[in-house]
Design a protein with these regions (language model features):
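N-terminal leader/signal peptides at the extreme start of proteins
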Residues: 1-15
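Compositionally biased linear targeting/interaction segments
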Residues: 2-3, 17-284
Length: 284
C-alpha cells in the first residue's frame, strides 16, 4: 500500500526537498535584503538631510557676512533707498549657494521707542490698544511677535500690523523707504504721505528703480518736493515738526536668505543685523 503522504511531500534528501529549501532560503534572503535596503535608505536620507541642514546653516552665516560687508562699508552713502537695497545677491560657496535680499528696519515704526500717539496711527490700532502696548510689562519687546501677548492684539490685528513695526529701528523712520502707512502714523495726512511716495518713484512711476528720487537728509524734503508739489501751510508745518523723527539712512537691516545644497533648495533664514551684531536669527 502506498503512503499517501509520499504523494504530497518529498522525502528528505530528494531533489524536490532541496529545491523547496532553496526557495525558502531565497525568500528569506529577499525579505532580509529588502529590510536592510529600507534601513540603509532611511539612514542615507537622514544623513543627507542632516548634512544639508548643517551646510545650509553655514551658507546662511556666509550670506550674513557678505551682507555686512556690503552694508557697512565706509564709503557707502549716508542714505538708503528702495533701489539701493533692492539688489538680489547670489553667490556660490563650495558645493552650495546662497541668495539674499535686504530690507532696512527703519522703514518701520519702533514700538519700543515711539509714543502712543504714533503707535495709534498704525493699521488696525487705536488709542486704547496703543496705550496697552506702551504700558505693557513686556515693553521693551524682544521680538515683534510678543505684541500678540498684549491684551487686545489679536492674530488678525498682528497680521495687518507686523510689516509696519519693529523693535530695533532706533526710533527714527527712513523717509526714503517708509510706506505711506508708516508716514501717516507719524502724523502726516494721507494725501501728503501719498505725494511723498509718488515723488520717490521718479520719472518711471515705479519705486525701487534707478531713477528714484532720493532725500539725502530729512531737512531737504520740502525743498526737493516744492518743484512738483504745492504744499499748504499746515502740511509744511507738519513736515517741519516731524523732521526729528525722520532719517535718510539706516542702522539695522533684515537679511532674507535662501540656501541651496547639492543644487536643491535647502533651508531659508532671516537675520536682523546691525554693525558688528546679529540681533535676530530665525529659520523661515
Amino acid at each position: 500500500m502506498k503512503n499517501s503522504a509520499g504523494s504530497l511531500w518529498c522525502r528528505a534528501g530528494s531533489p524536490g526537498s532541496v529545491l523547496i529549501a532553496a526557495i525558502w532560503i531565497l525568500v528569506m534572503l529577499t525579505i532580509f535584503g529588502a529590510g536592510l535596503y529600507r534601513i540603509a535608505s532611511a539612514r542615507i536620507l537622514m544623513s543627507q538631510a542632516v548634512e544639508s541642514r548643517i551646510v545650509s546653516y553655514y551658507l546662511a552665516k556666509s550670506a550674513v557676512n557678505d551682507a555686512e560687508a556690503v552694508l557697512f562699508v565706509n564709503d557707502k552713502p549716508a542714505y538708503d533707498t528702495l533701489f539701493s537695497l533692492s539688489e538680489e545677491h547670489d553667490k556660490s560657496v563650495g558645493g552650495g549657494r546662497f541668495v539674499y535680499t535686504v530690507e532696512d528696519e527703519e522703514r518701520r515704526i519702533d514700538v519700543n521707542q515711539s509714543p502712543a500717539e504714533i503707535i495709534a496711527g498704525l493699521p488696525g490700532l487705536n488709542s486704547e490698544l496703543a496705550q496697552a502696548l506702551v504700558n505693557s510689562s513686556l515693553r521693551p519687546f524682544a521680538a515683534k511677535e510678543e505684541l500678540l501677548l498684549v491684551e487686545g492684539i489679536s492674530g488678525e490685528i498682528f497680521e495687518g500690523l507686523k510689516d509696519f513695526v519693529s523693535v530695533y529701528s532706533g526710533g527714527k523712520v527712513n523717509i526714503n523707504t517708509a510706506p505711506a502707512e508708516v508716514l501717516t502714523a507719524l502724523g502726516i495726512e494721507k494725501s501728503l504721505a501719498a505725494a511723498i511716495v509718488e515723488f520717490r518713484k521718479g520719472a518711471d512711476g515705479k519705486e525701487g528703480t534707478s531713477d528714484d528720487e532720493v532725500f539725502e537728509s530729512p531737512s531737504e524734503v520740502l525743498s526737493r518736493m516744492r518743484s512738483k508739489v504745492s504744499f499748504m501751510t499746515a502740511q509744511e508745518q507738519t513736515l517741519a515738526a516731524i523732521t526729528d523723527l525722520l532719517t535718510a539712512g539706516s542702522r539695522y537691516y533684515r537679511v532674507k536668505i535662501k540656501t541651496y545644497v547639492f543644487n536643491k533648495e535647502a533651508m531659508n533664514y532671516e537675520a536682523l543685523i546691525g554693525k558688528g551684531s546679529v540681533l535676530e536669527w530665525r529659520e523661515r
